[in-house]
């Protein structure tokens, strides 16, 4: 994740259209097709997400937490009360990040969606992914 401002702006654009700005008790977010990053789950945490699902067709997300240092530094400057480490202090495996902020990275494509309980997601979004799903895969 070498462009934290792009990740943030993309998340914010979708979030602002979701109607969840005033949700007091947190929300559950799902991004379909996060690509090579868990950034949207990290950013959702800043906006009060209690759970984030990141669903993709394969395990393409960068596995080293050190690669998220730029994102953490960006968010630490943007928000006053976030609990992110400084990029120079990051030595954790990415699983510690996903566990700490309740981010579930699911890599079985549409089969991952079938594992979710009905009505368990408040906010679902996708950035340039839906056009890659073939119609027969929806059935």
Language model: regions and residue ranges:
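Class I SAM-dependent methyltransferase Rossmann-like catalytic core
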Residues: 1-25
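Active-site and donor-binding regions of nucleotide-sugar-utilizing enzymes
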Residues: 10, 27, 38-42
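Conserved class I S-adenosyl-L-methionine
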Residues: 24-36, 53-56
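Conserved acidic residues
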Residues: 27, 50, 122
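Class I SAM-dependent methyltransferase SAM/SAH-binding core
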Residues: 39-113
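A short beta-strand submotif of the Rossmann-like class I SAM-dependent methyltransferase core
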Residues: 103, 126-129
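A short acidic, Gly/Pro-enriched loop at the edge of an enzyme's catalytic core
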Residues: 111-124
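A short, conserved alpha-helix within the catalytic core of class I
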Residues: 133-139
């Amino acid at each position: 994740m070498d462009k934290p401002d792009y990740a943030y702006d993309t998340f914010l654009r979708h979030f602002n259209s979701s109607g969840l700005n005033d949700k007091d008790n947190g929300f559950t977010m799902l991004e379909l097709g996060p690509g090579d990053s868990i950034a949207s789950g990290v950013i959702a945490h800043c906006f009060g997400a209690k759970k984030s699902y990141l669903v993709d067709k394969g395990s393409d997300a960068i596995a080293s937490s050190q690669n998220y240092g730029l994102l953490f530094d960006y968010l630490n400057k943007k928000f006053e009360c976030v609990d992110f480490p400084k990029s120079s202090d990051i030595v954790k495996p990415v699983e510690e990040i996903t566990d700490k902020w309740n981010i579930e990275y699911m890599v079985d494509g549409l089969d991952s969606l079938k594992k979710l309980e009905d009505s368990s997601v408040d906010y679902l979004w996708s950035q340039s992914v839906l056009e890659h799903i073939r119609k027969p895969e929806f059935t």
